[in-house]
């Protein structure tokens, strides 16, 4: 293992990464900015990796919203260990951690969250990467989009929100699967690499038990994709 400490770019906060494991991309930061915080939110981060989505979300909102708390769910123990180190490094006491398969989330988490964040594997099946630990972060080898939707519905309170992103060409599938588990899409935002380019990502906010009505936000240009 080769651990490095990187800047989050907010208030001097830092995150612990491992160069031998999957490292976060700009997509995670986009999702943390897309998701909306409310006072008292109890937040779950599914497929958390080293925790960048939840940590960045907390950094953005900790001074604006009160009593935020988090549980990070991650299958790979080495990545979960990194997130624990990051929480300790930054003095974050609002974070708990849960290992194991997302499909086997403990009963104690049933309807206990007001917000679920999820940056999931984008690609369907097929193991092509020499490093299995990195491959399962990119491909649906250990969890599928439908399993994520089902688990999010299980974990969310009525009226709770799911903020999730995926490849733009999976929009129809995402809407269908979310609705199947009583998660109504309320906000939609495409992400493109440059102005006028075809979107490559889609970010959705869905509400458990919400009424049908969606707000389509302006396409977001990801400056990182232009560098």
Residue ranges and their predicted role:
Residues 3-42, 48-60, 205, 219-221:
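SAM-dependent Rossmann-like transferase core, predominantly class I methyltransferases
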Residues 12, 67, 92-94, 159, ...:
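A generic structural signal for alpha->beta connector loops
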Residues 16, 71, 96-98, 186-189:
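General small-molecule cofactor/ligand-binding pocket signal
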Residues 20, 143-203:
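Conserved Class I SAM-dependent methyltransferase catalytic core
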Residues 31, 119, 148, 206:
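Residue-level signal for inorganic ion chemistry
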Residues 34-129:
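Conserved SAM/SAH cofactor-binding pocket of Class I
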Residues 120-147:
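Mobile active-site "lid"/loop adjacent to the S-adenosyl-L-methionine
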Residues 195-227:
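Flexible, glycine-/basic-rich loop-and-beta segments that form/coincide
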